A protein has these predicted regions:
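C-terminal structured "cap/appendage" subdomains that terminate the fold
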Residues: 422-452
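Short, solvent-exposed amphipathic alpha-helical segments in soluble enzyme
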Residues: 42-44, 177-179, 202-205, 228, ...
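His/Asp/Glu-rich metal-coordinating catalytic cores
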Residues: 23-76, 81-85, 90-258, 264-272, ...
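Hard-cation-handling environments
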Residues: 235-374, 379
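Gly-rich Lys/Arg/Thr-decorated short loops/hinges at beta-loop-alpha junctions or inter-strand turns
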Residues: 208-220, 398-408, 429
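Redox- and metal-dependent alpha/beta enzyme cores, enriched for Fe-S-associated oxidoreductases
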Residues: 365-401
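Generic long, charged, amphipathic alpha-helical segments
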Residues: 394-425
């Protein structure tokens, strides 16, 4: 059972100035941090929650939902990453019974992601976990992209909501909320970068009177996404000269599929040895990848073109999947003892859990090992500690030497960079009355705020 904690999380209030209709947004997470997204919009006698995510890394705090829920009409989910849905079990434990709206792909991914979290983080039995998941499934309400729906159809002054493709992961969306007075409030969720081959680029909203936008990379420019496959090839070639394994920690949703997509292209174009073992050691990632294949209609133009060539970019024959834990243990021991070459893609992306941890414990001390960090490593995570160049790290109570070669590679971020964010905002035909910066570290938000202020935007 989930119990309510004695102390709650501090909510940060951000008031969008509309005195006549008394609209406000209260942040229950994800305002001053990258994780734990949970925003409550109160307007026109109604209230919506947008996401209810898990706090991770340095943001970790008690997860019990202490804020009032009796007045909340619905929960809107932008996508299925755990830092946007991970507090759902605590929300239910606090008595939430209202509809949970999301896209079809997100509705398929949410139970998968939560099941993994309930098992790993709470140690729930399958029976306990299924009880929670059954209730989540009961509340889920699937909505199509680009179609308005009323939160309270029986009210003449209902808030209306619309999902637009966000390009972040499969099923991801930014949320448009239309008020009775015609104003539109937009919550970006997590926006994807431009020019990724697997998902289409996000398009700017037609209107956003109040914009709440993520700033994960508000102060950074990614390397060119279109050339990332060649950078990956060069990194693999360099790593193979060391001998040993190439480890790539990757989130089960999004980055794993992007990596497989590029590796398939390198094999197809004969730029890496077709006999090099490509190991996907993440049961969750395997299930998610099957979901990606089922929702091919959401893929981008380049990905669909490969399908028309009868290629299988997420299920190519060289990709070996590891199902059971015994096989996983044998593989870790084999790579540690033989030093043979292989590419291992395993969760989790920030090295905070999952099967990648076993590989790190066994192979970080080996100078033949190469570790490619292909995404954001939040402060306080094992991934950030390794990335910062520490000579040793603590893993599950054991001090582990870091002799492996550590590489950081951009281009695989599922987040928009500074240029993408600016393009999204400046693409809105009329400037928002207010732009609220959320989901970012302080330095990123400050730098991005300065850019927007110079362009004449009102930034909070």
């Amino acid at each position: 059972m989930l119990r309510r904690a004695n102390r709650g999380n501090v909510a940060q209030k951000s008031v969008a100035q509309d005195r006549r209709n008394n609209m406000e947004v209260v942040h229950h997470g994800g305002k001053a941090s990258v994780t734990g997204s949970c925003h409550e919009m109160r307007a026109d006698g109604q209230a919506l929650l947008i996401d209810c995510g898990l706090f991770q890394g340095a943001d970790e705090r008690p997860l019990a939902v202490e804020f009032s829920l009796g007045h909340v009409d619905a929960l809107i989910l932008t996508h299925a990453h755990i830092d946007h849905i991970g507090r759902l079990p605590w929300l239910l434990a606090a008595g939430f019974k209202q509809p949970i709206y999301c896209t079809a792909a997100t509705a398929e991914l949410v139970p998968l992601m939560l099941e993994d979290g309930l098992k790993l983080q709470l140690g729930m039995s399958p029976k306990q976990s299924e009880r929670v998941l059954t209730e989540v499934r009961r509340l889920l309400r699937v909505q199509d992209y680009q179609k308005w729906f009323a939160v309270q159809p029986k009210r003449a002054d209902s808030l209306w909501v619309r999902f637009q493709p966000a390009g972040h992961i499969l099923g991801s969306a930014y949320v448009e909320i239309r008020r009775p007075n015609g104003e539109v409030v937009v919550f970006s969720g997590d926006l994807g970068p431009s020019h990724t081959p697997l998902l289409p680029d996000p398009q700017s909203p037609e209107r956003a009177d109040y914009l709440f936008i993520e700033t994960t990379y508000g102060d950074k420019q990614h390397e060119d996404v279109q050339s990332r496959g060649q950078r990956l090839r060069a990194m693999i070639e360099r790593s193979l000269t060391d001998g040993g394994a190439i480890l790539i920690p990757a989130f089960s949703v999004g980055r794993t599929q992007e990596l497989l997509f590029d590796i398939e292209q390198l094999i197809f174009s004969q730029q890496i040895d077709a006999n090099l073992p490509i190991i996907l050691d993440s049961p969750m990632a395997q299930r998610v990848t099957r979901s990606y294949r089922r929702f091919k209609q959401l893929w981008g133009r380049e990905a669909k073109a490969r399908l028309q060539m009868h290629r299988h970019p997420l299920a190519f024959e060289q990709c070996i999947t590891v199902e059971d834990h015994r096989t996983h243990e044998r593989l870790v021991n084999r790579l540690a003892s033989t030093g043979e070459a292989a590419i291992v893609v395993a969760a989790s992306g920030m090295c905070q859990g999952g099967r990648i941890v076993d590989y790190l414990k066994a192979l970080l001390p080996d100078k033949r090992t190469d570790l490619i960090l292909a995404g954001f490593q939040a402060e306080g995570t094992l991934g950030r500690s390794i990335q910062s160049g520490q000579s040793s790290v603590w893993i599950e109570g054991t001090e582990v030497e870091v002799n492996a070669h550590i590489h950081t590679m951009s281009g695989y971020s599922a987040h928009a960079d500074k240029a993408d964010l600016l393009r999204f905002i400046t693409g809105i035909p009329e400037k928002p009355k207010q732009v609220h910066l959320i989901h970012g570290e302080t330095s990123a938000k400050q730098a991005f705020a300065a850019e927007l202020t110079q362009l004449g935007y009102s930034v909070l």
